[in-house]
Amino acid sequence: MKYYLKEEFLKDSGARNAGNKARNDVEEIVKQEGFSPLLPTVEDWYKMSTIKAQQHKAQALSQAFSRLKSGDQLLIQFPMLHHSFFTTYLVKRLQARGVKVYFIIHDLEVLRYVNLDTVPLKHKIRVQLQESSLLKIADGLIAHNRIMKSFLVNKGISEQKIVSLGIFDYLIPDFQEKEELSKDQPIIVAGNLAQEKAGYLYKLSENPAYNLYGVGFDESRALENETYFGSFLPDELPVALEGGFGLVWD
């Protein structure tokens, strides 16, 4: 049988950002492809000591994995929400029982942290070791694009077991395509608008105009050619958007 690991956020499950959107869409798509959920029972390990939290997450994962049999396939979204120091060991043990394990990658922490001076070196090393050890043993990986694929290959992961997804799917219930778009309309920027993520928004030139959607925007610093519309849930955002072209950034 085909399964996907259904991990649930312990906090901020209804946050007005796209953090959960990609994961939820992957789950919806694989369910349509015949995958069944494999749900680990996890308590709030944020309130536990480091050692106890690691043990609790490993035990929850082990219990979920115990349902799988030889010939089964398991898809895991990466990074895992409830990763532990024992995850690589548990996946190896699962594979030894004849289960194929695949990962679809949303983010690589090592790429996000590599140029940040604020992240301690020991944390960078720990993240790199955890990511590389787990991804190297996967039976297959779905990467963002050829650049991420090349990065993984350079880390020693076999090119033959990596495929590139390209642009992520974005499921929109009851979507209706908007008409009469033109280049004369304001440019749309949607996402995390905080200074540390989108600092350029606070020093744009006078033209063109921009329509902004998302969390973290400092309205007191809004420019004359910027209109802030607030934040929306991911499924509600496409309907609320007003403007012409969208600006892709990160």
Where are the language model's segments positioned?
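Short, hydrophobic beta-strand segments that form beta-sheet elements in well-ordered domains
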Residues: K2-Y4, F35-P40, G140-H144, I187-G191, ...
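A short, active-site helix/loop in glycosyltransferases that binds the activated sugar's phosphate group
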Residues: K136-K161
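N-terminal pre-catalytic "stem/leader" segment of glycosyltransferase-like enzymes
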Residues: M1-H83, T87, Q95-K100, L111
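Conserved catalytic-core segment of nucleotide-activated headgroup transferases in glycan assembly
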Residues: Y170-D235
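Acidic donor-binding loop of glycosyltransferase active sites
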Residues: V239-D250
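Membrane-proximal helix-turn-helix segments that form the acceptor-binding/catalytic region
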Residues: L90-K100, P120-L141
